[in-house]
């Protein structure tokens, strides 16, 4: 049995897969409210994040960057993607395939389709491209690099496949308010290398990506 502090200061006990799933569900509900409040209070957050994003990360881990199209109150990656494209990045976007796997495809200016969870994604005819740098939305993160998503495992599975064939830098985009003491984690959950917020950069075990 192991544990850590939750967002309310309580203990997070990780004793079984069922309990971990329950803890994640509770935390998701709480963090949806936190993120919605942060987004409402700071409508210019995405612009500030893009302006202060460290170009050295792209220079080291580019040139192919997997972005995302924001849904609901996610931190909008569009201003950052525009800046990176200006620096020479090739931008690809995630697509959820019919088998549930996430691939990354070059939209090449074509209209996006509606995918699972309301995600705007490239068509199945778009070229699949392997990214070097993956930007991921999230609900919560901690300083160990743990990420709380929506529970489908799309990013964990995609990053695992990418890391099996070479280096990839896994970067979360978040409001600073989305940081918690400890995110419940299951064996298949992968750790972030970095989190970028409108307030600053948070390196997380950078050496994991450097070694790949």
Spans of model-derived segments:
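Surface-exposed, charge/polar-rich loops and edge strands
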Residues: 2-22, 26, 33-40, 125-134, ...
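Short linear sequence motifs
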Residues: 97, 147-148
């Amino acid at each position: 049995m192991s544990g850590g502090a939750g967002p309310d200061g309580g203990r997070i006990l990780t004793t079984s897969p069922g309990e971990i799933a329950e803890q994640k569900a509770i935390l998701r509900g709480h963090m949806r409210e936190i993120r919605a409040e942060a987004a409402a209070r700071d409508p210019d957050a995405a612009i500030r994040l893009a302006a202060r994003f460290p170009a050295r990360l792209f220079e080291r881990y580019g040139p192919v960057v997997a972005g995302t199209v924001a849904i609901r109150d996610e931190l909008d990656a569009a201003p950052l993607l525009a800046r990176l494209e200006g620096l020479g990045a090739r931008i690809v976007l995630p697509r959820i395939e019919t088998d549930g796997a996430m691939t990354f495809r070059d939209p090449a200016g074509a209209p996006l389709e509606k995918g699972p969870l309301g995600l705007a994604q490239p068509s199945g005819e778009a070229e699949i491209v392997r990214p070097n740098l993956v930007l991921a939305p999230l609900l919560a993160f901690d300083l160990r690099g743990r990420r709380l998503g929506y529970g489908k495992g799309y990013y964990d599975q995609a990053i695992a496949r990418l890391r099996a064939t070479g280096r990839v830098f896994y970067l979360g985009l978040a409001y600073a308010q989305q940081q918690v003491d400890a995110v419940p984690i299951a064996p298949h959950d992968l750790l972030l290398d970095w989190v970028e917020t409108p307030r600053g950069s948070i390196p997380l075990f950078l050496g994991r990506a450097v070694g790949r």
